[in-house]
Amino acid sequence: MKFFVFALILALMLSMTGADSHAKRHHGYKRKFHEKHHSHRGYRSNYLYDN
């Protein structure tokens, strides 16, 4: 049973790394969008704090 769970986790890790390498060019856009959203959130917090 433990071996089956280990094999399942290993297969999941391999599929995740495969998807990551396949969508590597989209990672930069995703990271840029996250940074933009984070800066917008910080600006909103400052705006609420100033009022």
Curated annotation (Swiss-Prot):
State what changing residue 32 to H does: Increased proteolysis of His3-(20-43)-peptide by C.albicans SAP9. No susceptibility to C.albicans SAP2. No change in antifungal activity of His3-(20-43)-peptide against C.albicans
Main localization, broad class = secreted
**Protein residues bound to Zn(2+):** 34
Q: Which GO terms describe its molecular function?
A: metal ion binding; molecular adaptor activity
PTM field = 24 proteolytic products are found in saliva.
Q: Where is this motif: HExxH motif?
A: 34-38
Question: Under what name is this protein listed?
Answer: Histatin-3
Q: What is the lineage of its organism?
A: Eukaryota, Metazoa, Chordata, Craniata, Vertebrata
